[in-house]
Amino acid sequence: MILSLNLLHKISPKLKKIPLNELCAALMDLGCEVETINSIKPSTNLVFAKVLEKTRHPNANHLNLVKVKANQKVYEIVCGANNFSVHNWVVLAKLNAELANGLKITPRELRGYVSNGMLCAYSEINPQATSFLTSTDLDGILVLDDNYDHYKTPNQIFNLDDVILDLSIPSNRNDLNGYFWIAKELCAYFDFEYVVDATINHRPHKEIIDVRILSDDVNSYGIIEVKNIQNYILKWNTKSILINNQIKVLNNFADNMNFLTLLTANPLHAFDARKISGQIVVKNAEEDAILLGLDQKEYLIKKGDLIIVDDQKILALAGIIGSNDSKIDATSTTAYIECANFNPMLIANTARRLKINTAAAMRFSKPLTNYVTKVTLKKLLANFKSDAKLIYYFKHSVHNVIKNKINQVSDFVGAEIDLDTAQTFLKRLGYKINKSNLITPSHRYDVLNEFDVYEDIMKKISIQEIKPQPISFDILNFENNLAYDFEKKVSDFLVDQGLFECKTYNLKNQTQAHEFNFFNFKQAYEINNPTSNMRSHLKLNNLNSLLEVLEYNQNQKNELENIFEISKINPVDSSQQTVLSIILCKPLINSKINDSLIVNNFVTTKALLHALLTKLNIDYAYDKNHVVNELYDNNQLALINANKQVFGFIGQLKNQVKKTYGLSNDIFIINLNLTSYLNQKQVITKVIKPSMYHDVIRDISVKLASDVDLNNIIANIKKIKNIRKVEISDLYIKDDGIIYTFKYYINDHLSNLSSEQIIIIEQEVNNYLKQF
C-alpha cells in the first residue's frame, strides 16, 4: 500500500505532531512493514500568477504571448499551451527557478520575444507522475480557478511537499488499504480519539428504480442516484493525491470515486442511468454468457458467477469489471453508483479464471466488513450532496462477539501487561468491552478469538519493551541435539541420492488429514476457528501432501522429481511422531549406456531403503503380514524392528490412488516412523588400518529375477576372502529380466595379490552367481 503523509495528516491532523521515525515505528508495531520512504523533489521559485493578456505570437502560430501578474509584478511569457484563458490562475516558474525535471529557468528569446519565466505543466514539476496523467493533462499547463487556497504555495497545493511510504500490510487486513482505517489504528496507538461514523440518515427513494438481491453471495449492497455528474470537477489538490498514491487520473467523475475508495478501501462502480432498462438484479448466472467489458475485451461468464443485470442485459461481472453496454461516457449526466460487498472467495475464483487483475477485483478478492461498505456509502452521499439520492441499501448484520479474557493476556505473553493500557487501546481501536464479552471493531473481520485480541494488545505494548525471560526447555539441556543430527543425516543422504526435500503445510481438511494413516493414529487434532475448511486439521501423514506436490508440478508441466519430507506428526492419542515419507516417480540410477533401459521399480526402491537404514545403523526385517490398502498386495512390505514392531512400509502405489492426483507414472513409496531412533547415540564403526596397496576392481554382470534378495547376494560375495567391498554399479532391462552389474574390490591389506590369487577370487564370484 502507498501511504501519503499529506492525506493522512488531512484525515487526522493530530498525527502531524508525530515525528516520521515514531510514525514508522508505530506502523511496524501495528503490523505494517515500512518498505521505503520517498520524498517528492519540489521545484523552486514557483508562484501562482493570474493571466492578464493572451495574444497569438506574430511570428509563430503555435506560440502565445502572455502577460501574467504575481505578487503585484507583471511578467511577460512566451507559451506554447492553449488550454487557458484570461483571468485563469496558472503556475509560473520565475527566472532562476529549478524544476523537478532538472530544467533551470533563464531569459529565453523565442522568435523575437523574450520569455521571462515559464508557465508550467504538472509533468514538469512532478516528472515521476507522467504515467498517471491523461493526455490532456500532459499537453496543457496547470490551470486553477479562483477558489484555490491563496495562502499556500504551488508545492503545497499540488502536494509536492509530500512524503510517500510504501507499506506491506497484513494479508488479512484488507481494510488497511483505506486511509480511514490506518488512521484509526495510528490514532489508537498514540492515544488519540478517531471515530468513523457510518450513520446514514437518507431515506431510500425506491421509486427511482427497483433493485433486487437474488444471491447469498451478496453481503451488503447499496446504490445511489447522482445527477449532474459533469459538474463534479476534482481539484488539483485532490487529483495530485491520487497521483501520489500511483492511481491514474481518468476523468473527474471516475477520479471522485477512486478518491473515495482510497479513503475507505471499498471499490465502487457506476452505471449510466440512461442505459438501464427496468430493474437492477444481483444474482448468480444461470447459464454461460459473453460479457464485453469496459476494456473492450470479451469474457466468458460461467454458470454460478455473480452478475448484475437489468431486464435486457448484463451490466457487470460483480466486483470485477463493468459492461461496455452500461458505462459512463462523456455525454453521461446521471449515474447509478453501486457500493457493495460480495463473497470474496467467489470473486477471487472468477477473477483468477478470467485472468482479470482490476483494482476492484483485487480488493473484492479479500474480505471487507459491511461496516466499511456502509461508511463508503455515507461518504458517497456526502460527496455528491444534493445531487445524490439513496435508492437502496441492504446488508447482513454481523457482530463478532467473543468472551472477555483480557485479564489472561499476561499469562499468554509471559510478562506483566498493564490491563488499563490494554483496554484503553482496544477501545480506541473500536472494541466495545463489558465484563463478560467483547464486540470486535465493526470494520474488522480478522478478530475471531481471544488470541487475536492479545495480538492487538501487543501492537501497543511492543514486544521489544518486554524484558527477556530465560527459556526452560528440556532439549536445551542436551549436550548435543541428537534428534536434529539424526534428521540432518537422513536429509543429507537422500539429497545426495538426487532426491528433493519438500516442506508442506501441516494443516489439511479432515479427510486428507486421515489419509495414508499407515501407523494407525486414531485421531487428528482439529483447529478452532480455522481460516478455511481446507486447513482445519493437523495431518497424520506426509504422503497426501507429497502427491499434491507432484500433481501441482505436473499441472505446471514441470518435470517430476523424486521427493521426500521429514515432518512432525501430532496425533491426539500419542506423543509427537517424526515420520519420513519418500516418493519415487522416476529412476534413481542413470544408465551409462541408454537412459531408456532404466526403470523405477520395487527392487531399486528396496535398495535405496537398505542403503538408508544401513547408513542410520537401523536393524530391520521385512514382514508380509501387515498390509495397507493404498499399496499393491504383491508389491508391498512392512518393516519391523527387533521387537517385532512395525515402523515402516515400502511398496508401489495403486493406480486408483494415483488417478485421484492425476498421476500416471509408476510411483513407489517409503514411509518410516523414525521417532524411536531420534535420540539414540550412533554406533561407533570400527575400521581396520588402511591398506598400503591399491584395490583390484572387477565388474561382473548377471541376469537376475525380480524377486531375488540383492542384499543377500552382496553379503555373500563379501564373505569371499580378500573382497572388502561390493556394490551395484549399473542395471538395465534385457528381454524378460534385469541385468545387474556388480563391482567388487579385492585387497589383501598386507601384501600385493598375485595374478593367480586374483583369478581364484574371480572364479569364486562367478561360481556363486551361476546358481542364479
Swiss-Prot record:
Enzyme class: ligase
GO molecular function, one term: ATP binding
Family: Belongs to the phenylalanyl-tRNA synthetase beta subunit family. Type 1 subfamily.
Catalyses which reaction(s): tRNA(Phe) + L-phenylalanine + ATP = L-phenylalanyl-tRNA(Phe) + AMP + diphosphate + H(+)
Record keywords: Aminoacyl-tRNA synthetase, ATP-binding, Cytoplasm, Ligase, Magnesium, Metal-binding, Nucleotide-binding, Protein biosynthesis, RNA-binding, tRNA-binding
Quaternary assembly: Tetramer of two alpha and two beta subunits.
One Gene Ontology biological process: phenylalanyl-tRNA aminoacylation
Subcellular location: Cytoplasm
Highest taxon of source: Bacteria
Chain residues that bind Mg(2+): 446, 452, 455-456
Keyword hit for Chloroplast: no
Main location: cytoplasm
Cross-referenced NCBIfam families: pheT_bact
InterPro entries: aa-tRNA-synth_II/BPL/LPL (IPR045864), B3/B4_tRNA-bd (IPR005146), DNA-bd_dom_put_sf (IPR009061), Fdx_antiC-bd (IPR005121), NA-bd_OB-fold (IPR012340), Phe-tRNA-ligase_IIc_bsu (IPR045060), Phe-tRNA-ligase_IIc_bsu_bact (IPR004532), Phe-tRNA_synthase-like_B3/B4 (IPR020825)
EC number: 6.1.1.20
Cofactor binding, per record: Binds 2 magnesium ions per tetramer.
Domain annotation B5: ranges: 397-468
Domain tRNA-binding: 40-158
Protein name: Phenylalanine--tRNA ligase beta subunit
Cofactor dependency: Mg(2+)
Every FDX-ACB domain range: 691-772
Gene Ontology cellular-component terms listed: phenylalanine-tRNA ligase complex
